[in-house]
Amino acid sequence: MAGLEAHYSARDIEARILAALRAAGLNPEQRLSPEDLAALDHFHTGGLRASRELLELAQIRSEHRVLDIGAGLAGPARMLAAALGCRVACLEMSPDYCAGAALLNRLTGLDDRIEVHQGSALDMPFADDSFDAAWMQNVGMNIADKRRLYGEIHRVLKPGGRFAFQEMVAGKAATTYFPLPWATDPADNFLVCVEEMRSVLEGSGFIEELFEDTSDAHLSRTAANAAPAAPGQLGLAVFVDNLARKAGNARRSLEEGQVRLVRGVLRAS
């Protein structure tokens, strides 16, 4: 866990975010929109596009209370709150990311709809049946105990509540390229194959409504040599060290079939 905490550490994240906003021509003293921040705060494969696609599938409504697991800087949470008017609880392990999320919630005026909790996805600080929907993007790859993870998600969902997710899963060959966006080395890389993921989800009380592999679609829509954000542009490099190498390794792993990208929507029985 110490390695994982270091991987997601971002010292002075609030100052770094504010400096990056000003360098990009945005005034933190004025109300920002979630779209202004999209290049910065959707820290998962496919970025804002992937979040919007998952939103179309998730069947979340304005009256719902939603849990965002491994929320990072809460970009998807702000997207949900702004687009639907729903209330979102963010659960994030990294204290640095929690601080950054709270700052950006204030700057977008969405802090009245989004709450940020620091904690573990394996021991969630919420009562049973607390949420109408759960949301998770590129988080399970860091968690070895999938049964406990999915069991906790099921516990905090109301009966019939939906769980929408996007994850990397193991491909046909071992993952060999490190560092990756989610793991500095193999010690924090806990990919499972699709068959195991679906089996554990079913055993945890979920009924599958949608499950699909989006690897090829993602690769076809993402340029292999996509340039990193230029100076003065917002991007993940504000808080992710060595981003170009990590992203390159992730793409190479996907191209060679070492990993696959999947998404799904399930219902809690």
Segments and roles (model prediction):
Residues 1-24:
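N-terminal auxiliary segments of SAM/dcSAM-dependent transferases
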Residues 27, 44-62:
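Conserved alpha-helix/loop element of class I SAM-dependent methyltransferases that forms part
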Residues 65-69, 73-123:
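Class I SAM-dependent methyltransferase SAM/SAH-binding core
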Residues 122-133:
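A short acidic, Gly/Pro-enriched loop at the edge of an enzyme's catalytic core
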Residues 133-145:
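A short SAM/SAH-binding and catalytic strip from SAM-dependent methyltransferases
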Residues 147-162:
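A short glycine-rich, Lys/Arg-flanked "PGG" loop and its adjoining helix->strand segment in the class I
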Residues 168-188:
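Short, glycine-/aromatic-enriched active-site segment of Class I SAM-dependent methyltransferases
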Residues 210-269:
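Conserved Class I S-adenosyl-L-methionine
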